[in-house]
Amino acid sequence: MLQSEGELVAPLIERQGIKNADYMFSAAKVIIELKILQTDFAQTTQTLEKVDELIAKHPGVDPDDPTEPLRRELLLLLRKPLQRVINTANRQIKETKRELGLHDWSGITVCVNDGFRSAPPDMVLGLLGHILAQTSYSNTDALIYQTNHYVELPYSPYANLLWYPTYSDPTNDGLVDFVNDLGRKWRQYSAKELGPFDVSEEYDSLDLVHASVVTGLRRKNRYTGP
């Protein structure tokens, strides 16, 4: 972030006990809070115990059937920890705006998925999208979902790192341009740190329905591209 003309917020906060956001970009009037998902929420002992309880509560029901209450209750288990993350980020952006008098600035939460790998990308994004749609986050104008692990796409022969932005107002061209530029700089930085990529592409839209987290050398789904 600092290599993209951003600066740390913390040194600018004078009062003690303020839970501030991480970065600010003065030229674009943007505040960014970075959240890293380090826990695999679906694999914690507490979650697994609750899953067993729900399955026992709904005997014989297919947990993958979207029409069944069991499916909705299972997804709710994963939604709750993600909602806590988004709630915290929104509050930190709000506190930063208030402390520094940046009331007309835009707020962005960058959600980096490092450890939550048991859920496919479309499920994580679906949960995040549902959270943002069902709750008022007046200080979060955009959310960027980024992966620190590789993702397999049926229509791509490569393992991919995702940078997937969503907006509360997609007609805010200035914010969209800023996010796109930040994404390009992130790709350049990643290529410098990790080595050159085989391909670096941008899409107006991305179908993640059959995307999956790369866990080994073999593909999970057949490559369907040209």
Where are these regions (language model features)?
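Terminal interaction module
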Residues: 171-175, 179-190
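Metal-dependent nuclease catalytic core centered on acidic motifs
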Residues: 37-175, 194-226
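Beta-rich catalytic cores
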Residues: 19
